A protein has these predicted regions:
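Residues forming the flavin
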Residues: 1-121, 125-240
Length: 240
């Protein structure tokens, strides 16, 4: 999310995963499972965009019931931050929009209204049956982790029936490190001659990536703890 007036983006993890919202492209069509991990979701955005799918940016749609009870990005639920308390600069089609009907919302944001209405009909039907026939949202254990167990039959799907309706714009982004300090198997930082620099250790995201590709959320935590342990062993000379 690109928040007006903020230099840094906002990572969407929980908000797009909980029930009561769905995400569409310019044509008003869904293109991915919103409740899956953020890496796979953004990968879908890139893959579909390369095929000509206008899904970058994409648009998270939710209704007043969702707005009342759940936060969305920096926007707190309406019970804590009513619309009157939302910064005026946030009300911009490039970030946050509101309208009494889906048709009006689509016009404000620039989404195909017919496609959006058809998508909402499908999402509402899936929320009744508990089965997302398009992208299997809620079938996976990861999906359900951020779902709401009080919502039945699928903790990741809830109908959108109460206006006004809202739209939050989502952009693909990159979260990680490029480059970093080179270390050896004792977590010692190496110089340009691949020799350890005395007294200098590093671990985690400040070092060169150990893996050629990011396999999923939290994958840097294990190496960070392991090399922190190895650094402590080398510093203390302990054999444990």
């Amino acid at each position: 999310m690109n928040i007006p007036g903020h230099e840094k983006g906002w990572l969407s993890i929980v908000d797009k995963s909980v029930p009561g919202n769905y995400t569409v492209n310019k044509n008003g069509h869904r293109f991915s499972n919103e409740s899956q991990n953020y890496v796979s979701f953004v990968t879908d955005m890139f893959d579909e965009y390369e095929k000509g799918n206008p899904c970058a940016p994409c648009y998270m749609i939710f209704d007043s019931n969702f707005r009342k009870n759940r936060p969305c990005g920096p926007l707190l639920q309406a019970s804590m931050q009513p619309d009157s308390r939302v910064p005026k600069e946030w009300w911009d089609p490039s970030f946050l929009s509101k309208a009494d009907t889906l048709e009006e919302l689509a016009e404000i944001v620039g989404i195909d209204a017919k496609g959006l209405i058809k998508t909402q009909v499908k999402v509402n039907e899936y929320s009744k049956t508990g089965k997302d026939l398009d992208f299997q949202r809620g079938d996976d254990a990861y999906d359900r982790y951020y779902g709401d167990p009080s919502v039945k039959p699928n903790p990741c799907l809830a109908p959108l029936n109460e206006g006004p309706y809202y739209c939050m714009v989502l952009y693909p982004g990159e979260m990680g490190t490029a480059g970093g300090l080179v270390i050896d198997t004792h977590a010692r930082v190496l110089d340009i001659y691949n020799q350890p620099i005395k007294g200098l250790y590093a671990c985690g995201n400040c070092t060169t990536a150990l893996l050629p590709k990011y396999p999923g959320p939290g994958s840097t935590l294990g190496p960070a703890m392991t090399f922190g342990y190895l650094a402590a062993k080398d510093i203390t000379g302990a054999n444990f």
